[in-house]
């Protein structure tokens, strides 16, 4: 885009951890992006979308399943990026993977369009409600897969 320098693009890509794979590309930032970005993994596309968002300095970001369909290594990069992005503006995140939202200021647990409970990760765990049940199930599933 006009008005955005290569230096600013590099800085933002580093900020969201996209530099981890961009530096390995044959043409770096000048790499051709094929239709639907199919020459990149789902996680790489997600990191690029974060960079595109951050470069425009939004006050509100809406993220829907930011860590869906990605490998564990890329999930860690995305989670690190999300943590950094919290300082950019307000984030509204939709997530089934609870590890994605456990550092959120406020978590709202919905079921069939109704709010079941809300609070921080620690507050919701202490309530032993639906969030606690979901977290326990996901945590045990992840432990068994390791």
Stretches found by the model and what they are:
Residues 12-16, 28-128:
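ABC-family ATPase nucleotide-binding domain "signature/switch" substructure
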Residues 20-24, 31, 133:
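Residue-level preference for short helical/loop micro-motifs built around acidic side chains
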Residues 23-27, 142-143:
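Short, flexible cytosolic linker that couples an ABC transmembrane/permease module to its adjacent nucleotide-binding
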Residues 24, 110, 137:
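Conserved residues at the C-terminal ends of beta-strands
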């Amino acid at each position: 885009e006009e008005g955005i320098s290569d230096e600013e693009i590099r800085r933002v890509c580093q900020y969201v951890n996209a530099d981890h794979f961009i530096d390995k590309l044959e043409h770096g930032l000048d790499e051709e992006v094929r239709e639907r970005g199919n020459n990149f993994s789902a996680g790489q596309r997600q990191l690029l979308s974060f960079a595109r968002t951050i470069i425009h300095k939004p006050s509100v970001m809406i993220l829907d399943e930011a860590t869906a369909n990605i490998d564990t290594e890329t999930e860690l990069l995305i989670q690190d990026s999300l943590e950094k992005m919290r300082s950019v503006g307000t984030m509204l995140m939709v997530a089934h993977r609870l590890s994605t939202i456990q550092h959120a200021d406020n978590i709202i647990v919905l079921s069939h369009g109704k709010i079941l409970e809300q609070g921080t990760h620690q507050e919701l765990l202490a309530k032993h409600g639906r969030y606690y049940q979901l977290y326990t199930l996901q945590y045990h599933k992840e432990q068994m897969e390791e």
